[in-house]
Amino acid sequence: MQGLIHLYCGDGKGKTTAAVGLSVRAAGAGKRVLFAQFLKDGSSSELNVLRALQNVEVACCTQNFGFFKAMDGQTKAAAQKAYSALLEDVMRKSADGVDLFVLDEAVAACNHGLIEEATLIDFLHGRPKALEVVLTGRDPSQHLLDAADYVTEMRKRKHPFERGIAARRGIEF
């Protein structure tokens, strides 16, 4: 079976949730899943479920660099080194019998220069034929849009944050 590329993008809620849902579905069908998370420290609630499933490996950077806008130059350099190493590691692992490879927030990591988009594009074009790949994040480049077989855009119409309601554990993270 030919693996396809999914891109979940947009300013709305649900990109990671959709990727988690597909991961659960794939694991339920006996497929091996590699779920890599960028720009997050691995403490999101949905990862607890993924870690409990057979056939699912979760990879993330254990260091928390904070929000990109608040990073100084030294922190950005450290984040770039850590996320680039994570990308190289998970790309290598994905060739070892993985059926579904999720790169959560890889689009944002590219946009902030924390991983090289060219490296990601080269991987997508040279990946194992049967490997299904999911990318998530806001504002994908035209190169990523062109590489994708599915593009799903989540659009925000209204969000509680606009009324001062903070993100809630178990709902938004």
Language model feature labels by segment:
Residues 33, 133, 151:
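Hydrophobic anchor at the start of a short beta-strand
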Residues 22, 48-51, 73, 115-119, ...:
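Short, glycine/charged-enriched secondary-structure capping and boundary segments
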Residues 25, 49, 123, 143-144:
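Hydrophobic/aromatic ligand-binding patch that stacks against planar heteroaromatic rings
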Residues 136:
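Conserved D-loop beta-strand region of ABC ATPase nucleotide-binding domains
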Residues 139-173:
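Phosphate-binding/switch region of NTP-binding enzymes
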Residues 39-42, 64-65, 107-108, 139-142, ...:
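Conserved nucleotide-binding/hydrolysis micro-motifs of P-loop NTPases
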Residues 70-132:
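Phosphate-binding/switch loop-helix module in NTP-utilizing enzymes
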Residues 4-92:
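Conserved P-loop
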